[in-house]
UniProtKB/Swiss-Prot annotation:
GO terms for cellular component: plasma membrane; proton-transporting ATP synthase complex. Pfam families: ATP-synt_B. The gene is atpF. Belongs to the ATPase B chain family. It is found in: Cell membrane. This is ATP synthase subunit b. It comes from Mycoplasma mycoides subsp. mycoides SC (strain CCUG 32753 / NCTC 10114 / PG1).
Amino acid sequence: MLFQGFNVVINATTQGVPKIVESLFPNLPNFIAHLLATIILVIVLTKLVYKPYKQMIEKQTQKITEVLSDAIEKQTQANIKIKQANTLLEDAKTESVSILKTARIDAEIQKNKIIDNANLQAKNIQSYAQNSIKQEKIKAQLEIKNTIVNLAINSAEKILNKEIDKNTNKQLIEEFIKELD
């Protein structure tokens, strides 16, 4: 009835316009039933399809967020480990340079010790040789002196043809040689 009254109002105001309202709402009870069925269908579909779909999307979003945060954390840890490795590498390089310098210094010290030791041994050998030469020279001088004394005694004996006491003669000759020196 309401619909008929509505129809009358529309028809009375617009006369030449086709009956649009009648074609849109041919039967009001059918329209209300369709409207209620559509609302119920939307509610049922919302509960059966939309909410599980929304929950699934939220779970996927949460998984993606977890994976991204885990990836960021792992990337951060990897960057920290790379920095630590670089620091360790730099420390190793510095230590190797230090070890090389120390080894060179130690080698130089050992070289100098060996050279000093060799020089000392050479000086000792040279000193020993000089002492040996001096001793041999003294020996040779004594031998020459003794030979000269013996020659002088023999010569004097031959000249004088008589034998003088050998000790006295020897003393005379030694005094003569000392005077020559």
